[in-house]
């Protein structure tokens, strides 16, 4: 695979942006301009380059609005996103909402009550003419992951769903996006609690808004990377009728342990923290990952964040059985053989003990970056959409007329 940067991590993150071009998330030329300004393993140059690109795109959008060019404005606002600080992410959300208002399908901005707070959410309704004739609209809940924002999730699911007659609900839960930065709510391993709150509100809003025509008997949950872990957790709720687990890990603690020197666990906490910070000064990727973990988990130190991440497992921890063994709905599990992470896809698949191989559980293992072999299927969204929606159509009994 061609690499834009020597760093596998930075190259993956660049592909993550570039891969959204087909769904209006970026313009290829703008990405190449940004890449020329980014230094390898330099977070500051990364931020500066994308900020400049976002500001230019936002200016273009405002100009297009002033002359009535909705198409240019939609493109511009969809890609003028920046997520560094609260002020920046708030601006990103505002621009995304401007883009949504210019889409050719309805978008509802919602709030989900959760433990005294209100989680922001979007409901992307299908494009007119794509609805299933004579039936209500099936629903996809797209849960984010470790470092995504829900505005990014649009490209991974809703952009394809709205063209195929599906409704998509995205939201930001504790430890994610603006909820983390504004409300200081931190991530939790038992994500089924969050999904339960989302489903409760979805049922209430659907009853209050019959015009949405939502089918509450056909709800799927979709997640990529850490979102795949969250999706499996959410699938414990029997209101979920299908689950897409895209490139997930079974045990996040194990992933951390495999990259940590064995002697660290025997050192005094303060000394271990100092040593860890020194070692990470030479490792950009791990330094970013642990620093982000400390933020999303609300810990005061990197070593404490490392301890907390051990709780994020599909194993029996605090349960009678591992999570996958209690899932009853059909599950599509995907692999990413070119992932920069060591996935545990086979372990997840084999743990779905209530499922029949190739029937109620299916494994998709694409070969090649262009076919979807990177983590979360970045840079291959058309293949992601084709595979996921073909499977969902079958499981949720969505009937389509063959093209002439």
Model-predicted regions and their roles:
Residues 367-404:
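Catalytic active-site module of serine/aspartate enzymes centered on a nucleophile-bearing elbow/loop
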Residues 352-373:
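Catalytic histidine neighborhood in serine/cysteine hydrolases
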Residues 185-213, 217:
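Alpha/beta-hydrolase active-site loop
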Residues 48-50, 54-57, 85-135:
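N-terminal cap/lid segment of alpha/beta-hydrolase-fold proteins
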Residues 236-310, 343:
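Hydrolase active-site cap/lid region
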Residues 327-328, 333-335:
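Short beta-strand/loop motif that positions the catalytic acidic residue
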Residues 339-347:
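Conserved alpha/beta-hydrolase "acid-adjacent" motif
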């Amino acid at each position: 695979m061609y690499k834009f940067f020597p760093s596998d991590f930075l190259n993956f993150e660049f592909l993550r942006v570039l891969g959204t071009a087909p769904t209006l998330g970026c313009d290829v030329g703008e990405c190449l301009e940004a890449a020329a300004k980014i230094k390898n393993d330099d977070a500051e140059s990364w931020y500066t380059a994308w900020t400049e690109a976002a500001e230019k795109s936002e200016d273009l959008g405002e100009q297009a609005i002033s002359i009535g060019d909705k198409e240019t404005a939609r493109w511009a606002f969809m890609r003028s996103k920046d997520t560094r600080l609260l002020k920046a992410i708030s601006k990103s959300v505002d621009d995304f909402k401007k883009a949504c208002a210019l889409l050719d399908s309805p978008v509802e901005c919602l709030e989900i009550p959760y433990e005294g707070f209100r989680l922001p959410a979007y409901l992307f309704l299908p494009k007119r003419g794509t609805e299933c004739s004579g039936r209500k609209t099936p629903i996809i809940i797209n849960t984010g992951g470790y470092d995504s924002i829900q505005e990014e999730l649009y490209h991974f699911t809703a952009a394809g769903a709205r063209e195929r007659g599906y409704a998509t609900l995205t939201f930001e839960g504790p430890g994610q996006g603006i909820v983390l930065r504004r409300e200081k709510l931190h991530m939790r391993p038992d994500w089924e609690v969050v999904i339960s709150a989302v489903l409760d509100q979805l049922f209430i809003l659907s009853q209050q808004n019959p015009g949405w025509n939502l089918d509450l008997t056909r709800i799927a949950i979709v997640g990529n990377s850490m979102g795949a872990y969250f999706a499996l957790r959410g699938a414990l709720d029997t209101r979920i009728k299908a689950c897409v687990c895209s490139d997930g890990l079974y045990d996040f603690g194990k992933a951390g342990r495999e990259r940590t020197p064995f002697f660290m666990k025997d050192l005094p906490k303060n000394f271990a923290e100092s040593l860890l910070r020194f070692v990470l000064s030479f490792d950009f990727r791990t330094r970013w990952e642990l620093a982000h973990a400390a933020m999303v988990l609300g810990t005061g130190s990197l070593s404490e964040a490392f301890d907390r991440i051990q709780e994020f497992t599909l194993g029996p921890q605090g349960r009678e059985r591992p999570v996958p063994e209690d899932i009853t709905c059909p599950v599509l599990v995907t692999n990413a053989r070119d992932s920069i992470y060591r996935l545990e896809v086979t372990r997840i698949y084999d743990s779905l003990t209530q499922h029949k191989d190739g029937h109620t559980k299916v494994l998709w293992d694409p070969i090649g970056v262009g076919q979807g072999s990177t983590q979360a299927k970045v840079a291959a969204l058309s293949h992601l959409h084709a595979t996921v929606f073909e499977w969902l159509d079958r499981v949720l009994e969505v009937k389509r007329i063959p093209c002439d």
